């Protein structure tokens, strides 16, 4: 069975490695294949399951009335496990999901939402920072909006699980 058959696909979003369901599915498929090739291997997903369960629990504890926006759709697969509401302006989101540049109107809508206190949390990807994303981050800083940085890959020297734990810990401090 293909991963996409059991994992929710968010249209146009390639950041599936942040989806706990995808992590479970990949680990299960790898363990199954190892055990098929070598019946003495006894490959298990126990460690992955433990990490994933902890991540899901932390995400479920985020405030229910949280409104968030993203400078790039890096956290869709993380935030789908929360009851928070994505308030990223639609035009801005469409531009970034297709790897395009948002219009001046999209930027204005985003900064207005921040200034009007409609955004509790800004999710910012420092690894894909553009001038537009930097301006949005500055507007969020000026408005005292919480900012959580989530990169596409862990910083140098940091392994995935440690980084993912740090990301969910940062979200949990809101």
Q: Which residues does each predicted region cover?
A:
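Extracytoplasmic metal-acquisition and chelation regions
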Residues: 3-174
């Amino acid at each position: 069975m293909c991963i996409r058959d059991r994992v929710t696909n968010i249209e146009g979003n390639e950041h599936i490695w942040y989806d706990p369901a995808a992590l479970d599915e990949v680990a299960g498929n790898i363990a199954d294949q190892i055990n098929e090739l070598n019946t003495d291997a006894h490959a298990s997903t126990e460690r992955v399951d433990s990490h994933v369960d902890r991540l899901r629990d932390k995400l479920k504890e985020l405030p229910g009335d949280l409104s968030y926006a993203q400078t790039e759709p890096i956290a869709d697969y993380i935030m789908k496990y929360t009851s928070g509401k994505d308030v990223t302006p639609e035009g801005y989101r469409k531009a970034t999901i297709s790897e395009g540049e948002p219009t001046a109107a999209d930027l204005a809508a985003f900064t207005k939402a921040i200034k009007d206190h409609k955004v509790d949390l800004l999710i910012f990807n420092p690894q894909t920072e553009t001038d537009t994303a930097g301006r949005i981050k500055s507007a969020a800083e000026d408005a005292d909006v919480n900012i959580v940085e989530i990169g596409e890959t862990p910083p140098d020297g940091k392994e995935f699980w440690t980084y993912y734990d740090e990301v969910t810990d940062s979200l949990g401090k809101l």
